[in-house]
């Protein structure tokens, strides 16, 4: 089932939160949904999950509108860290069973297997768990739902490093992966970079880009060396930041480098470094680029 977002706009209290959003998701891929605070990520997720209706445009799964469509809504699962009043005193086991009742594809055996891996005692009440353990339970519910579209919104908040690493492993190896669309909305970009097949970057309510991770990582680099040589090399390129360290100049550039340019840079004793995804994200969404 493909998920398609077509020309979606949303206005809240006379403020346009999303403007003409277009994005496409295909099964078997893990998508990184990236954006600064207030960019519109949460609003977009709430639309996919049918928490609210679009003002303009459409969101469809397998060609069918999701909003108020029970058949399609069954295939979308939105996971985020929250305490629902009805679950605070429930045992974890009861929490899992209640989710299984409302999710046709939910795999309870898989859920309990995951809880064991996360070292969660399912006889404890959800409220007695630490924040990180609660996050692990919520992550378990998302993975075990086997929903065609599973959205994790900052689900690793509160998890310690080993638990986050285990979650990442399970995302990559999750059951029925080839038929699922997994969307990860996160600010921990450096840790999750290796998970993403494609990146969708939201900035100021618009889709800044949708590209494969490999394509995107070819898009930014730094050039370091003697100031005059750096300036000559980056002339007519999209330089978004210039930094000086003594006699050394470092330019951050958005664009692609061909083999001949790389060879020329080496001849000029210039140091070329690819930007990590987090650095690239910061650079692309920074409205105050310039000199340091």
Identify the meaning behind each predicted range.
Residues 151-156:
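Walker B catalytic motif
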Residues 35-40:
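Walker A (P-loop) phosphate-binding loop of ABC-type ATPase nucleotide-binding domains
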Residues 71, 78-138:
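ABC-family P-loop ATPase nucleotide-binding domains
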Residues 3-5, 18-20, 33:
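Conserved structural motif at the start of ABC-family nucleotide-binding domains
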Residues 49:
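Helix-to-loop junction immediately C-terminal to a conserved catalytic motif
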Residues 245-292:
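C-terminal coupling/interaction segments
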Residues 57-68:
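Conserved ABC transporter NBD signature motif
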């Amino acid at each position: 089932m493909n998920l398609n977002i077509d020309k979606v706009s949303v206005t809240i209290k006379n403020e346009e939160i999303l403007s003409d959003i277009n994005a496409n998701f295909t099964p078997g891929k893990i998508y990184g949904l990236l954006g600064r605070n207030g960019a519109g990520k949460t609003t977009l997720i709430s639309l996919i999950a049918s928490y609210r209706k679009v003002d303009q445009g459409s969101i469809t799964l397998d060609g069918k509108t999701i909003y108020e469509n029970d058949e399609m809504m069954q295939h979308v699962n939105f996971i985020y860290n929250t305490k629902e009043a009805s679950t605070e005193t429930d045992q974890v086991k009861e929490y899992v069973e209640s989710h299984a009742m409302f999710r046709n594809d939910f795999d309870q055996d898989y859920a309990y297997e995951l809880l064991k891996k996360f070292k969660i005692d399912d006889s404890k009440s959800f409220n007695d768990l630490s924040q990180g353990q609660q996050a692990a339970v919520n992550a378990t519910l998302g993975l075990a739902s086997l929903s065609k579209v599973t959205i994790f919104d900052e689900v690793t908040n509160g998890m310690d490093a080993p638990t986050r690493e285990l979650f990442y492993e399970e995302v990559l190896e999750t059951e029925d992966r080839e038929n699922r669309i997994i969307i990860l909305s996160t600010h921990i970009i450096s840790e999750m970079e290796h998970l993403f097949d494609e990146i969708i970057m939201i900035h100021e309510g618009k889709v800044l880009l949708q590209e494969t991770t490999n394509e995107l990582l070819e898009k930014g680099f730094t050039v370091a060396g003697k100031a005059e040589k750096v300036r000559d090399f980056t002339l007519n390129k999209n330089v978004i930041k210039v930094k000086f360290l003594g006699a050394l100049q470092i330019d951050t550039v958005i664009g692609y480098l061909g083999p001949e340019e790389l060879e020329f840079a080496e001849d000029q004793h210039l140091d070329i470094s690819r930007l990590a995804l987090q650095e690239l994200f910061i650079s692309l969404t920074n409205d105050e680029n310039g000199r340091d």
